[in-house]
Amino acid sequence: MVFYLEILWFYIAVFLAISDEIHSRIMWGLFADFYILLAGVIKESVASNIRLWIVHEFMEAIFHFVLLSIIFLSLEIGILAAIIHMTVDLYHEISGIELTPLGHRCLHFTIESIFFILLFAAGLPT
């Protein structure tokens, strides 16, 4: 059990990366037409591109929350993973940094790993 807790941050970061890939492949592959129509409906509701983008990021965070909560059987891990993933996405877009897809994935993995290492180092219960 001690080994599991010491490397839990790594598992969370890996499954969050896998979750992001699953989200991309499902939404832009399997449901691309629906996703585009949904974006049009949401844009009409929120009336600005920035709000549309924030709604998109929030919906993606919900996807990560559900998936990671199920995988780790922990609502806390699901919530924290979704929040840190959304925060990295928001920061990356606002900062204007141009990254390749691999660079973007590395940015997420690094920040999310550091976040969970610090969280577990602080001794917070999961």
Predicted regions located by residue number:
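Transmembrane helix interruption/hinge and helix-loop junction motifs
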Residues: 5-8, 69-78, 123-125
